[in-house]
Regions:
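Helix-loop-helix connectors at the membrane interface of multi-pass transporters/channels
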Residues: 74, 107-135, 236-240, 245, ...
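C-terminal membrane-solvent junction of multi-pass transporters and transport-like membrane proteins
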Residues: 88-93, 323, 330-343, 365-427
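Transmembrane helix-loop boundary segments of multi-pass membrane transporters
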Residues: 29-46, 80, 161-170, 245, ...
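Loop-to-transmembrane helix boundary motifs in multi-pass membrane proteins
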Residues: 6, 12-14, 20, 138-142, ...
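Transmembrane helix-boundary motif of multi-pass solute transporters/channels
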Residues: 9-49, 228-234, 241-248, 252-255, ...
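Membrane-interface "cap" regions at the ends of multi-pass membrane proteins
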Residues: 1-29, 57-62, 66-79, 83-87, ...
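Membrane-embedded translocation segments of transport machinery
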Residues: 2-7, 11, 164, 168-313, ...
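Inter-helical loop and helix-membrane interface segments of multi-pass membrane transporters/permeases
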Residues: 2-5, 32-37, 67-91, 104-162, ...
């Protein structure tokens, strides 16, 4: 057993992994890309890549963690077994810390938006002015601090127990709230135009290479394959759990979350005659304008931002857990000291990049360069340094039927090759995730 404990159930493990995977990309990027790149036609390459990355990408990271019985730094040292091994894992760990720093800033905006809804400040003032004020340097420190306080308090106690309990509450709540939003939105006049945007297939887009590139990037980043975060969750996994099955369940629920977001967001946007966009503008400018115009808008705006907060907190938990677990073991410090140190560093750095332009550039560097390279490093480490025989032995635990040669081919040759392509295309396209 890992000294931080084990997940008590497969359900708890899967929900924790879904919590890590479901994040801002599902909410502010997937709905737009689904409509922009061919509607239902986009789902064909997207589902292919989700299945592939879920099966051989997630499974590999889970298996490495369970085999090594430790997270990022220890797992890479376990594989490389040389004097450089203890240093190799620092790059993926830097990716986890870097994305956590930027993510905490964005979650601070979500918390500030919740406050704006509760006080009615969001709707009584100009929405663009509210957003501009919120994203200035040092303008959102209290909400930003609250984000990290909540997350660190959840991580302070026994790791697996806190993570499992938090995700068993927050992830079902996320799905329930978005289902309610999707049902309400379906009753709007003009919602049909949003459904057409999302689901009327434009088959010619399948001949467009950009459709496949964006589907691949969306699927890859949506599953939190970073060469770090999912390894630490694997380290907390019992030997009797079927890893490939749990990986596919994670991929399925992540896809359902993305589809729910699309069903709740785009029909609402079209109902009020607003042009669809992606990214922070969709969440913090377009959707508040929709809520402002609709009956009971405050109520549904609160529903929406609370749902986003749930998804964001569960993702941030995983990012910080990867760092805390590694620091615990590398520096031989208590869990509370590791969490406190991680929280302080994250807060200090993230406060300095609160400005919307600065955090945008920060996230670009992390998501275009660091995380794709770290994910590639993880893929090579698992499939070539650790090797197929050791990986297969771990994957077969808890299964009635052993994994076959198809898994080896998809992982060792297709997945690793695509990880290289994702890194290159991300740089060429200035981001595909």
């Amino acid at each position: 057993m890992n000294k931080n404990g084990n997940f008590k159930s497969t359900v708890g493990f899967v929900l924790a992994c879904v919590g890590s995977a479901v994040g801002m990309g599902n909410i502010w990027m997937f709905p737009y890309r689904l409509g922009q790149y061919g509607g239902a036609a986009f789902l064909i390459p997207y589902l292919i890549f989700i299945a592939l990355f879920g099966l051989v990408g997630l499974s590999a990271e889970f298996a490495l963690g369970r085999m090594a019985k430790t997270g990022t730094l220890g797992a890479y040292a376990y594989c490389w077994k040389n004097k450089f091994g203890k240093y190799i894992g620092w790059l993926p760990l830097l990716g986890s810390l870097g994305i956590a720093i930027g993510y905490s800033v964005i979650l601070g905006w979500v918390f500030r938006s919740i406050q704006g809804v509760l006080t009615n400040e969001l709707f009584t003032n100009s929405i663009p002015a509210f957003f501009t004020n919120m994203t200035q340097s040092f303008s959102n420190v209290p909400c930003h601090f609250l984000v990290l306080l909540v997350t660190c308090l959840l991580l302070f106690t026994s790791a697996t127990n806190a993570i499992e309990k938090a995700n068993k509450v927050l992830m079902p709540a996320f799905f329930i709230l978005f289902i309610i939003l999707a049902i309400r939105v379906s009753l709007f006049n003009g919602a049909i135009e949003g459904y057409k945007f999302l689901f009327v297939p434009k088959w010619e887009y399948l001949l467009n290479k950009e459709t496949w590139i964006m589907a691949m990037g969306q699927a890859f980043f949506s599953l939190s394959i970073t060469g770090s975060g999912m390894i630490v969750y694997g380290a907390y996994l019992k030997d009797d759990v079927d890893i490939p099955k749990a990986s596919m369940q994670t991929a399925i629920f992540d896809t359902i979350a993305a589809m729910l977001a699309a069903l709740a967001i785009m029909p609402a946007v079209f109902s009020f005659g607003i042009d669809p966009v992606s990214g922070p503008s969709l969440m913090f400018l377009t959707l508040p304008e929709v809520f402002k115009q609709m009956p009971l808008g405050n109520f549904f705006a609160l529903f929406f931002f609370v749902s986003v907060a749930f998804a964001g907190i569960t993702s941030l938990i995983n990012m910080l857990e990867a760092v805390c677990e590694s620091w615990q073991n590398r520096f031989h410090i208590s869990r509370k000291k590791a969490v406190l140190l991680c929280g302080i560093i994250t807060f200090i750095v993230s406060v300095c990049i609160e400005n919307g332009d600065i955090v945008g550039k920060w996230m670009d560097v992390v998501t275009i360069y660091i995380i794709p390279f770290a994910a590639l490093l993880g893929a090579i480490t698992i499939y070539y340094v650790l090797g197929w025989n050791a990986l297969k032995q771990e994957l077969d635990k808890g299964r009635k039927k052993p994994v076959g040669p198809t898994f080896k081919f998809l992982g060792k040759y297709v997945y690793v090759f695509l990880a290289i392509i994702i890194l290159i295309l991300g740089i060429l396209y200035n981001g595909i995730g």
